[in-house]
Amino acid sequence: ERISTGVMNELADRGYQVVIVLFGTDKTSAFPLNDKIKILLIGIPFENKYKLKAAFYLKKIINEIKPDYVINVAVPMMQVSFLAKCLGMKGKVVTWDHFTLFAGSQWGVFFRIFSAFVSHQTIVLTEQDRNSYPRLLRKKIRVIGNFVMDAKFKSNLMSKKVLSVGRLVHTKGFDILLDIWGDISKRHSDWILQIVGSGEEKENLRKKIEELHLEENVQMIPTVKNIEDYYIDASIYVSAARLEPWGLVLAEAKSFGLPIVCFDCPHGPKNIVRDGMDGNLIALNDCNEMKEKILLLMDDLELRRKYGEAARKDFECRFSKRAIFNKWTELLK
């Protein structure tokens, strides 16, 4: 929702007339919305038994406001917009998918392929995601990554802090990172690992910190609004994620000029981190290699600066608001 809201706000600022159509009866947004954006309610829950009725009302709303494009935020929305299209809804339908083709069940794969077939265009996050679709559909699929707000400041890379940000869930691999940090702290007891995030694995991770006697070397910080303060104060960014569909935090780290060490897990990191240029991509679960690359950056300020400068420049070229919205403008022209 944060990404979707950010895109809609920026499009409104750029002169596009943006109308958000919501299911249900609640107009509340978890994130601030541009005053230029209009919100309309279908007034029907997003449930299977109501989808045909919802499609009828969606067709009515869309044909009244006459947009050039109808953007489905996520593939499930396509089910209703497809029915609405069959009922006579006008406008080109674009489906914006934030997940990989094979995320979820076999039905999910079917719906994604069907969605790409019936949509005017489909937006995916990475080139890997695009290439996972059948070849005949790829010409209708565009790669537009999530944009990241430009950092006002960048780290001076002088602190003795390593940062990792994300939900405290199994796929993010914080348990692996703690094992790696247990070895690193024996050599660099003056460095601190900061883990910022909340989630179901919180207590398990706290127990692991105690078992590894890392209470003085690891700080666990709940999700915060001022996350930029932690990026600015760090010298290295690390991710031991087992799975990362895109990797918003990696792009954020680059915006602050942080060198990155992360596992080359499916599907996002290799699309963001350039191995040996602005960070290091480590073979999945090669904990020893990750430890060595982190230690190398700890011991070499000039290497941190080299990677950090390259990270910042690459962010501006590929992940900044300007770069991403050039692609949106091309799509919507």
Model-derived features with residue positions:
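A conserved mid-protein helix/loop that constitutes part of the nucleotide-sugar donor-binding site
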Residues: E1-G6, K160-K186, L193, E200-K207, ...
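A short, well-ordered alpha-helix in the C-terminal region of glycosyltransferases
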Residues: E289, L296, L303-R318, I324-E330
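Short His-centered aromatic/hydrophobic patch
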Residues: N72-Q79, D97
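Donor nucleotide-sugar binding/catalytic pocket of nucleotide-sugar-dependent glycosyltransferases
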Residues: V118-K152
